[in-house]
Amino acid sequence: MIKNFSVTGKWIVSLMFFTFAFSQWAGYDVHQEEYSSTDLRIFIEGKTFGLSANSSLIISPENRAYVGIGLSKNTLFRPNTYQKQLSGWVPNFSADIFITNNLYFIGRISQFYSEEDIVHSHNFGFALKSGEDVSYPWQTSVVFCNLSGPRDFALRSVSLTMAILIQAADHQIQIGLGKEMYSAKFFLEDANFPTAMKGEINYILLGMNFERDSIGIFPQIRFHPRLIGTSVRMTWGIG
């Protein structure tokens, strides 16, 4: 496990820092001359994917708190009017604080420039996990998300996940299901655009856990019929 962590972990860390330094962040401009309600809904669903937390399953916490950095990105299954806006990365900073051995607080915050907008997002919620003496450790979480800053819209969502951890050879694989319930409000003075949009996203979650000492790396993929959300998070244990 240590060898695998060393090779894979160093590669992921290098990729994350390279992305933070040189990547183009995601766009948030929704006004288009050729408006499509289907494309707009997929755009909002993609932003919801990027907004929700990568909630890693920490089985044996050696620290009371974990801080970290993360990146998320979406891939569409078919061409979309908002392809460019959805192709960039979304950065965030995270904190997981254990209240008890089985319950911990989830916090995420992000702020970055996107064209002429300063985008803000913050998430908070809780995760409940099983004990360490079960064959398949599990975790369920609820996270409340908020996005503001773009001139065209604001977005809120509630993220629900249920996942288990399976040991396969030397790897820990996370498998689960998730639901995103979102509500978007648009500020455009255009009769063709709706004033609001609500919906739900159901998806399959697949991830891996790489942990050594107080450092953890958690890549994760979310599968939805219209898009794939990928994210990676690196954490450090403190306290």
Positions of predicted regions on the chain:
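A short, polar/proline- and glycine-enriched secondary-structure boundary/capping micro-motif
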Residues: 117-118, 185-186, 228-232
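Outer-membrane beta-barrel transmembrane domain signature
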Residues: 24-60, 64, 70-85, 145-218, ...
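Glycine- and aromatic-enriched membrane insertion/assembly motifs of diderm outer-membrane
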Residues: 81-135
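Outer-membrane beta-barrel architecture
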Residues: 94-96, 123-129, 161-165, 205-209, ...
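Secondary-structure boundary elements
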Residues: 101, 132-136, 167-170, 211
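Contiguous hydrophobic, core-forming segments of folded domains
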Residues: 128-148
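N-terminal signal peptide c-region/cleavage motif recognized by signal peptidases
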Residues: 18-21
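Bacterial N-terminal signal peptides that target proteins for export
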Residues: 2-12
